[in-house]
Amino acid sequence: MKKKIESYQGAAGGWGAVKSVANAVRKQMDIRHDVIAMFDMNKPEGFDCPGCAWPDPKNSASFDICENGAKAIAWEVTDKQVNASFFAENTVQSLLTWGDHELEAAGRLTQPLKYDAVSDCYKPLSWQQAFDEIGARLQSYSDPNQVEFYTSGRTSNEAAFLYQLFAREYGSNNFPDCSNMCHEPTSVGLAASIGVGKGTVLLEDFEKCDLVICIGHNPGTNHPRMLTSLRALVKRGAKMIAINPLQERGLERFTAPQNPFEMLTNSETQLASAYYNVRIGGDMALLKGMMRLLIERDDAASAAGRPSLLDDEFIQTHTVGFDELRRDVLNSEWKDIERISGLSQTQIAELADAYAAAERTIICYGMGITQHEHGTQNVQQLVNLLLMKGNIGKPGAGICPLRGHSNVQGDRTVGITEKPSAEFLARLGERYGFPPPHAPGHAAIASMQAICTGQARALICMGGNFALAMPDREASAVPLTQLDLAVHVATKLNRSHLLTARHSYILPVLGRSEIDMQKSGAQAVTVEDSMSMIHASRGVLKPAGVMLKSECAVVAGIAQAALPQSVVAWEYLVEDYDRIRNDIEAVLPEFADYNQRIRHPGGFHLINAAAERRWMTPSGKANFITSKGLLEDPSSAFNSKLVMATVRSHDQYNTTIYGMDDRYRGVFGQRDVVFMSAKQAKICRVKNGERVNLIALTPDGKRSSRRMDRLKVVIYPMADRSLVTYFPESNHMLTLDNHDPLSGIPGYKSIPVELEPSN
């Protein structure tokens, strides 16, 4: 693997994407049999992409797949297997020396496994033995709240519903979830602002908008199929403006791989009409600057007898809190706005002008907005900006959070939450005849804190790589090994499986692409995309191993063993997933006619009250919510000279690392790098390719023991006073205490650091 730093000149997509897909297929898949499955991905009669949550268009191309979706499916249907012979040759201690890419690249898990401390190896056992032993451990605990039930966003609606049902009959609301680490500020912030913790737009709204503002996200890597929608709106004359600390190729220009003309002529579409490199941690200052300019110009227009720039009728009829917001933003000083945002008043005025001129605006955002200590307030400032011009609840306008994993939103909809509503619990109890627990449980940060203090004794993970995704992983590694029980439901080996508890199990399951055969025949599961569309997913490939079970079957097996007197007919439900969906419909009325509607091509849309200007808030209206000050990360209040954000590489999805390249950013064969601007490199007196150390700072500006050594400097077009490193390698630079108090999300996107040359 050749290591190099070399500027990539191509557009997003194009022949670079085709070559990358070919390499992924060649390394992982049986080309004769498995590649054909890609033609069934994101199709009504096929399976949903196991990658991102971008919605499927109604009339999609015959090959509706993106580069990273292809990598995800190649990763899943690999011919390589991790079985008993693999573990006979590799102890857990030896595997801990492997890289995270190497661990998952070893292949698919195909047998139930139990850790044997004497040999330091995982050894196979039968499914029934695994269920019985896990059930016995769960029965032994005096308090059900000693168990943490983690969920990954790859889990289907059906499996997630059964999982929460099992945990609540067991007696716990402990539901740490991957969404706690990515879009929890969306769920909390939007619910407080507009009454619904989800986005308000549909894919069709991108066909009607005048302007799309993309802030704090990177579609070229994290949701590449979005580029097709951005290309289409630009082609018809609408504008897209990008706001991001780094210049990301997927926001700049795009060559559509499905377009023969563009591929043959090497032509491309310019996406962003303007690009603003906001400083890391400067989003709130920028947004308040925009709102201040809009209000001042609206005041001037009113004084001169000109039409209002704001939607006064909408504000008066549908909102509360505008006067308080007005006072707050008008009191924000320009010198502070410019210093914190890294943008001049002139640049912010350009943004305000573009927004004022547009009749219909969509704001799209990702974890660059949410992963801050005030991530919830960041989301609410985006809503404030939209409410000022009535851009919620009309065609071609709205808020568009870009969720990560393909069903992370659906899992929450069907009950994966540590704070369930009283109505949900009442309907669940009525359906099944048991009293669910009402006390709030643990989200991700609280669950890890419970593990670290010894309060938690067991961890069950429905997918994911919990240990690697969390902050402060060095501090949490030892407590994880001191648990009594760890159960990992998974398709691939990862580092979390190697932090073994007293009793550790790995339970292998079917992938999204594989046929799920139950007593009534082949089953479909359902997922919910970022825009609240529910659709079916049907596997088409032969399972990777004869012993694999579905997620639903695994949950039912554990539940039956742990709850021998259960009131739930677990086997009956798993025999036919229509029965699970009937129960979901009974508990959640918005799923009316569930089984009938998922059989329609494309599925159905869950009603979003805010999109219809029905405000399910205590005030009965949309709320302008003021956030005091301009800092979205109070731990940086001492005005650290350098702030670091963690990001994915292009060969990565969440904690899964498909390869060692980051093509669009020009990094190949390596991940031990730190990105900075040329101006910042000059200030720090370092050059491209030199090695440096980063030391995390405490909230009072002092050096901590958390550090990253010998990172290679990559000079890159981006904001100054900002550094970028890769997630999850840099997660340990953040403590468990560095999180948003409203949503609990870790502040991965704004870690104050100090830089020094490496010896």
From Swiss-Prot:
Q: Does the keyword Iron apply?
A: yes
Supply one GO CC term from the record: membrane
Binding residues for [4Fe-4S] cluster, per the UniProt record? Answer: C49, C52
Q: Which UniProt keywords apply?
A: 4Fe-4S, Iron, Iron-sulfur, Metal-binding, Molybdenum, Oxidoreductase
Q: Which cofactor does it need?
A: [4Fe-4S] cluster; Mo-bis(molybdopterin guanine dinucleotide)
InterPro entries in the cross-refs: Asp_de-COase-like_dom_sf, MopB_CT_YdeP, Mopterin_OxRdtase, Mopterin_OxRdtse_a_bac, Prok_molybdopt-oxidoreductase, YdeP_MopB
Q: What does this protein do?
A: Probably involved in acid resistance.
Question: What is the protein's name according to its record?
Answer: Protein YdeP
Q: Which organism is it from?
A: Shigella flexneri
Supply the source organism's classification. Bacteria, Pseudomonadati, Pseudomonadota, Gammaproteobacteria, Enterobacterales
